[in-house]
């Protein structure tokens, strides 16, 4: 009976981790520290405690969009342009920022490799007009082995750059001296000038993911072929919203807004890809959210 109680308690803990996950970064919670394994994936070497993505578009005040008849649309009426019109927009007046956050815990010493991170980004060899920018990159290792939490902030010495082809590069982040029990937090922004290209977002990983949330506020004149996974643990919705254009401080008029679609994709307690595929007997492919592209923001 005692053994049965312990098993039930472990299952209850796993459920609690999924429903009360700490989404604030900078200070792991007591629940994060108490996580020493997950009954649903007992062989897991590491676990993603929390992973979030927020995509926001920024339009300059003189941004212009055109419908397929090339007639100019004002900031007020652009929302009513034909759906999917993305060819006739002034791309130099629009940018988008991917704000990525992830917290991973190493469960076994053999899982230290999951502290590493690869960021693929667009960076042309010749014309860098539309190249991506990576900013606000922060990597912090939290160690609680002595009962007192110690923070270790990493700098640029822990990463290298590699060119993949004429258009893309990858930033390899390698975190050394990581052991079982350590928690690693990553945060960065990726600014893209390619408004009609949407990078993919991985809901599922090679290790368990307790909580992930993807939010995208996309102007309505841009329409992507969203591939939201059909999975019992994934919930998605889209709501009407808006993108506010910047204005001068002296401008007393109401700020101009462009109609947008606000997408939210959220999942809890996702099994590793291989284990999930095995249990579900190949009913559904590994979960991915994305548009036109093959980018894996986090690996």
Task: Explain the meaning of each model-derived region.
Residues 1-24:
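Bacterial Sec-dependent N-terminal signal peptides
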Residues 21-299:
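Beta-strand-rich, non-transmembrane domain signature
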